[in-house]
């Protein structure tokens, strides 16, 4: 699924509106993923706590959203732009790529909750397409 010029512009516009709350979005989305899909906790067994609001969840939520923010700037070539992150997740962290989609779903939920007026159906569509493209780019090294 490719991103049109309109999709890219919509993602950039929405990211600009929500980026000030990206840490909160990341922490909430990660907390939701860990609660709704408890099997994902296996990747974080070294943490003291996977509970919502724990320092580890907040920190990793911030890291995730910083990575997504970087991806927003590399939308024209996500595969090449995220090569290092793809290699990290495939070879070192060994994250099942299915989890990228699970996290994306939770990010969409949190964005809709936090930005009900800005997260229009068109914004939802564009951000969803972007997160799908991002997940695909991160999965590239698994092939």
From Swiss-Prot:
Sites of the modification N-acetylserine? 2
Listed A to Z, the keywords are: Acetylation, Heme, Iron, Metal-binding, Oxygen transport, Transport
Tissues showing expression: Red blood cells.
| Binding positions for O2 per the UniProt entry | 60
| Alphabetized CDD domains for the sequence | Hb-alpha-like (cd08927)
Q: Which InterPro entries match?
A: Globin (IPR000971), Globin-like_sf (IPR009050), Globin/Proto (IPR012292), Hemoglobin_a-typ (IPR002338), Hemoglobin_oxygen_transport (IPR050056)
Quick check: keyword Iron in the entry?
yes
Task: Domain (Globin): give its ranges.
Answer: 2-143
Mention any one GO cellular component term assigned to this protein in its UniProt record.
Answer: blood microparticle
What GO terms are given for molecular function?
Answer: haptoglobin binding; heme binding; metal ion binding; organic acid binding; oxygen binding; oxygen carrier activity; peroxidase activity
Gene Ontology annotations of biological process type: hydrogen peroxide catabolic process
Q: What does this protein do?
A: Involved in oxygen transport from gills to the various peripheral tissues.
**How is the quaternary structure described?**
Hb 2 is a heterotetramer of two alpha-2 and two beta-1 chains. Hb 3 is a heterotetramer of two alpha-2 and two beta-2 chains.
What's the name of the protein?
A: Hemoglobin subunit alpha-2
Q: Which organism is it from?
A: Boreogadus saida (Polar cod)
